């Protein structure tokens, strides 16, 4: 964007009439397989109703990049049992990356990892709704979105997969007895989703405890805030950011299946989804 002449942002683009047909196709590709172009496509999608000559230049660059990398393939491999695999969430953020309103961008990618397994499952790229005061605040918001929208739902599903396909390895756990109404509701939901209710047990464990979620963050300050919780020194943190921080502290520290670890910037896979 810094290399695009400023006057092009105020001139209507040549492709303004076709942008609404081109961008959704690129967005579909980015959501299904090409997570490396998701940030660019999201940026173009926000400009569909106000398409400018600068957007023409961005779209041309995107099409050229996709053409040059059309023969590249994503290599995935699975060689382990479900109980031997774990989930890894890479979370990152670009501080004040938007030139118009100085808002940051959240990015994250969730992978299934094992000794002989590596499969990217889903990814997210989202512009934050509030302006952050620092990189740490922006990454807290990104981490909250990744854990809430990707990490925890996938952890629940993967724990269920392990229990269904490897029931003989299931450890003994305390049971939570359900009422008749709760059992009927679970069976109805299972029938709607899977078309069968055979796998629904008469009682559910309090927590499966076999699936694990490793959250990888490249900012030491964010990790310390999550592990120690919010302190009075963070008085400048806004209400929304404060709720996100408290929720992460409570969720990660009280859940034995969630772990936060540091990862180097070069190994941070979520970086490509933020810029």
What are these regions (language model features)?
Residues 86-136, 243:
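RNase H-like nuclease fold core
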Residues 47-50, 129-275:
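RNase H-like nuclease module associated with reverse transcription
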Residues 14-19, 33, 51-54, 82-83, ...:
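Secondary-structure capping and boundary motifs in well-ordered enzyme cores
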Residues 1-74, 264:
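C-terminal reverse transcriptase regions that engage the nucleic-acid substrate
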Residues 64-94, 194-205, 209:
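Structured nucleic-acid-interacting core domains from mobile-element enzymes and related host factors
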Residues 15, 26-27, 74-78, 95-99, ...:
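Generic recognition of flexible, low-complexity loop/linker segments
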Residues 40, 98-100, 224-225, 271:
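Short helix/loop capping segments that flank catalytic or ligand/cofactor-binding pockets
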Residues 34, 40, 107-110, 270-274:
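Short, conserved catalytic/metal-binding micro-motifs enriched in Asp/Glu and His
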